[in-house]
Amino acid sequence: MDFQLQAVDDNARAGVLNLAHSQVETPVFMPVGTQGCIKSLDAMDAQEILGAKLILANTYHMYLRPGEKVVEQLGGLHRFAQFQGSFLTDSGGFQAFSLSDNVKLQEDGIVFKSHIDGSKHLFTPIKVLDIQYSLNSDIMMVLDDLVGLPAPLKRLEESIKRSAKWANMSLEYHKENNRPNNNLFAIIQGGTHLKMRSLSVGLTHEGFDGYAIGGLAVGESVDEMLETIAHTAPLLPKDKPRYLMGVGTPENILDAISLGVDMFDCVMPTRNARNATLFTHSGKISIKNAPYKLDDTPIEENCACYACKRYSKAYLHHLFRAKELTYARLASLHNLHFYLELVKNARNAILEKRFLSFKKEFLEKYHSCSH
């Protein structure tokens, strides 16, 4: 993997990630395709309509169903899903903790029960890499010990030491395997405790292809999250991409870009879409509300998304009320277009050295009204 930093505006960064299956401009928002597809969308929607170059899939889910060996036998995740861009896969540790009963944390990994059939499994740092090799992920995440917040200092210290140990084991194993098309990212932990974040960075070896700031958006306040990002991002190598995992709102993303973050993922645009909340530059609207029953205008005037070019709010309102599956597709296409355009416009502003004014103007309009 090659990462080229093209411009810096204050702390905001614009760059290019050259991966085996695509060239990705940063800042980048990655739509979440947990099971190998974005919910309600297929690969053509992702690449042809949205223009997405990099999407996220989930190691835990692909391992349990259909199984990584099935995916490998069918040509890897790209061929299986017919997606011509790149895949980032997370390690599955978060899902093992959050979806399983009776999770047991061990020094060598995580023991968990499948949420599908109750079968028992062990994820180790090596095993999750082998799974991701079978999937042929462009970017692989190391297994980490994620802590919900608030958490005692002792638990945070255990987490960062274990996460760093697992990350460094993963790096050594990855070097032995000599797979240049499968890039490995480390994950920095430490909750909102700034000294713990510094310690996590110090314990994690150099030599990873990128670095993620993990363990946020798990119960802390927005101010605590931003303070943690502001402290952690400058500690990471300047010549490597920085990934903020699982965050978040349009405001969160712009704030994190201003603090030097390059990569984002979140289920918010698609989950909100399915639950009737649509993003516009003037704030969010709830398409299920009665005023939209006779509204013949698009979700947002001047929006170039597939849904806005073809359909009215009244039609979307009807589809949602009728529980039609087509609603989820159209609403998800709109919300993802909004997110992808947001980071694209942020990137252009960084290249033109006007990011702070762009951010200010966007937020002023975005907070002007919601319906």
Swiss-Prot record:
Positions bound to substrate: 90-94, 144, 189, 215
Record text on cofactor binding: Binds 1 zinc ion per subunit.
Domain of life: Bacteria
Region ranges (RNA binding): 246-252, 270-274
GO molecular function, one term: metal ion binding
EC assignment: 2.4.2.29
One GO cellular component term: cytosol
Keywords: Glycosyltransferase, Metal-binding, Queuosine biosynthesis, Transferase, tRNA processing, Zinc
Binding site for Zn(2+): 303, 305, 308, 334
Keyword Cytoplasm: no
Reactions that this protein is recorded to catalyse: 7-aminomethyl-7-carbaguanine + guanosine(34) in tRNA = 7-aminomethyl-7-carbaguanosine(34) in tRNA + guanine
Database matches in InterPro entries: TGT, TGT-like_sf, tRNA_ribo_trans-like
UniProt pathway annotation: tRNA modification; tRNA-queuosine biosynthesis
Active site, UniProt feature: 90 (proton acceptor), 265 (nucleophile)
Keyword ATP-binding part of the UniProt annotation: no
Cofactor: Zn(2+)
Listed GO biological process terms: queuosine biosynthetic process; tRNA-guanine transglycosylation
Family per similarity comment: Belongs to the queuine tRNA-ribosyltransferase family.
Function: Catalyzes the base-exchange of a guanine (G) residue with the queuine precursor 7-aminomethyl-7-deazaguanine (PreQ1) at position 34 (anticodon wobble position) in tRNAs with GU(N) anticodons (tRNA-Asp, -Asn, -His and -Tyr). Catalysis occurs through a double-displacement mechanism. The nucleophile active site attacks the C1' of nucleotide 34 to detach the guanine base from the RNA, forming a covalent enzyme-RNA intermediate. The proton acceptor active site deprotonates the incoming PreQ1, allowing a nucleophilic attack on the C1' of the ribose to form the product.
Assembly notes: Homodimer. Within each dimer, one monomer is responsible for RNA recognition and catalysis, while the other monomer binds to the replacement base PreQ1.
Protein name: Queuine tRNA-ribosyltransferase
Organism: Helicobacter pylori (strain J99 / ATCC 700824)
